[in-house]
Amino acid sequence: MAQRKGKTVILESKPCIIANAGVAGKKESEGPLGEEFDETYEDTTMGQDCWEKSETELMKRAIELAISKSAKEKTEIDAVFSGDLLNQCIGSTFALREMNIPSVGLYGACSTMALSLCVAALSIESGGFSTVVAATSSHFCSAEKQFRYPLEYGGQRTPTAQWTVTGSGAAVISKERSDISPYIDKIHIGTIQDYGILDAANMGAAMAPVDVKIEP
């Protein structure tokens, strides 16, 4: 049974990350983590006619790859905890609509992957699920449309505007233990920190204080 120590939850079952997958676009493939991705794509439209559908394809591919690498069947996955940067988490819902796996939509902006891992681990700890997936996605072009200006508008980006990743990541978490796989033994959920950042383009500055403020 999980135990609380201050604001930290200690997980007795230590859910194990038995597989993971990451896919990304051209720009990400050229960065320092380029060789770490399972797949990268020169064409970031993913053959789709809008950016939201492109992001959907990224998440779908990441989840399918992670499940395949886990040697599990989709019927063995109890639930998927996933989210993205789009309204109503449509990237997640459209990616999962043909998989027939129970799903929970989550929204934590740039913390969605960490949030999905936390909730997934708690679901294993509860005994309700045996094997679940945690996933998230984003796409530079759909994020610009959602939070700044559509690329078609041709607006000039400010120097403080971050570049949102085009990619998706997924992890399969299980109650099964492995001597070589990482596991989740503690989770710590953060609080809202508002430092009064007024530059709407500089989302990184608004989020950074939460990353550095750790309380026992």
Give the residues covered by each predicted segment.
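Condensing-enzyme catalytic core mediating Claisen C-C bond formation in acyl metabolism
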Residues: M1-C50, Y149-P216
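Conserved beta-ketoacyl condensing-enzyme motif
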Residues: I17, W51-C110
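Short beta-strand segments
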Residues: I18, G83, V132-S138, I173
